[in-house]
Regions:
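Basic polycationic patches enriched in arginine
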Residues: 13-19
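Terminal transmembrane helix and immediately flanking juxtamembrane interfaces
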Residues: 5-6, 17
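A feature for loop-to-transmembrane-helix boundaries and adjacent hydrophobic helices
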Residues: 25-328
Length: 328
């Protein structure tokens, strides 16, 4: 059961208040990793025999603490730009055009991703508005970034008088590359996980490293104590999504030479990513909910996206087959 199902309850409000306190807790206690005064491991994939004794979430350079969350997202952006520019060059387009777009897209996508997250988790920020600007503890929603990026591309292509769908077809290859890498920022932040599981990929996390608002009643019931240290055992949904997105990217790289119309890669991205997000989001304990409901906003948005993308692809391909039959 998700602890946020009853968003009007006193328990829900109390848990949401803990999130703001948790950010301060991270600032005070996680300076490149917790010092718990114990030899217990921070994290392990118990059924794979993989143990991480100490999981840092940042590094310090010249006195400045840099979160791995931000580093990984930055690396994902660079890798995404490289993939998009490479595909643009293959198609005879000017890669510099994509670099110019990226300067705007990165800024507005980060703003959009943060705004989306804050809007649907407003109770965690309304009493401490400055925390809205603290990105080191996480809190970027990919759909907010995608929406902002799409709007930016619409404006950019209109100004440059070029095809929106033509740029989008190469752009989504870079986008999903960034998503593949970016999810590992969630790993270092010990977030974006699901409920209790005993499957092959089950991940066990030291409970004290986790934001209390992300720990569902189910996880509390299945709490594991080893050598006096409490752990939760979860679905590593960040890993599921990263691997799923890798599969979508590989398919798109294979299919791109076979595409039938401009914009097809964009719709394939929406369909492929949406299908994965529908089921993965259902596993997560930190879902952003539509106010007044128990519905996960990203899961609902994914379902709508799948229906629209699937319909567009079906109609366009049927039209192309009919046209080919008529010409024959």
């Amino acid at each position: 059961m998700n602890v946020f199902e009853d968003c009007g309850s006193t328990q829900c409000r109390a848990i949401r208040q803990q999130r703001g306190q948790y950010v301060s807790y991270l600032e005070q206690n996680w300076k490149g990793g917790f010092d718990m005064g114990s030899s217990g491991a921070d994290l392990s994939f118990v059924n794979l025999g993989i143990t991480i004794e100490h999981l840092p979430n940042s590094i310090t350079l010249f006195g400045f603490r840099i979160a791995f969350y931000g580093i990984i997202i930055g690396l994902g952006m660079l890798a995404g730009m490289a993939i998009a520019c490479s595909d643009a060059k293959r198609r005879g387009q000017d890669p510099d055009l994509y670099l110019d777009f990226a300067l705007y897209a990165i800024i507005f996508s980060i703003i959009g991703a943060r705004a989306y997250y804050v809007i649907f988790d407003w109770d965690s920020y309304k009493d401490n508005l400055l925390q809205i600007f603290n990105l080191r503890a996480g809190g970027l929603a990919i759909y907010g970034g995608v929406i902002a990026g799409a709007l930016t591309l619409m404006i950019f292509t209109r100004i440059k008088k070029i095809s929106f769908f033509s740029m989008a077809d190469s752009g989504v290859l870079g986008l999903i590359t960034g998503q593949i890498m970016g999810r590992w920022g969630n790993f270092f932040n010990c977030e974006a996980f699901g409920g209790y599981t005993e499957n092959l990929l089950a991940m066990r996390i030291r409970k004290s490293l986790v934001n209390p608002s992300m720990i569902s009643a189910e996880l509390e019931q299945h709490q594991i104590v080893e050598d006096g240290i409490a752990y939760i055992q979860v679905h590593p949904t960040f890993l599921y999504e990263s691997v799923w997105n890798l599969g979508v990217l590989l398919f798109m790289l294979w299919y791109r030479k076979k595409k039938k119309f401009e914009g097809e890669m964009l719709w394939i991205y929406f369909l492929g990513y949406g299908l994965g997000r529908v089921w993965i989001e259902g596993l997560r304990t930190d879902q952003l909910l539509i106010p007044g409901t128990g519905l996960a906003v990203s899961q609902m948005l994914s379902a709508v996206m799948v229906l629209i993308a699937g319909s567009v692809l079906f109609v366009r391909h049927r039209g192309l087959r009919r046209k080919a039959g008529t010409e024959a």
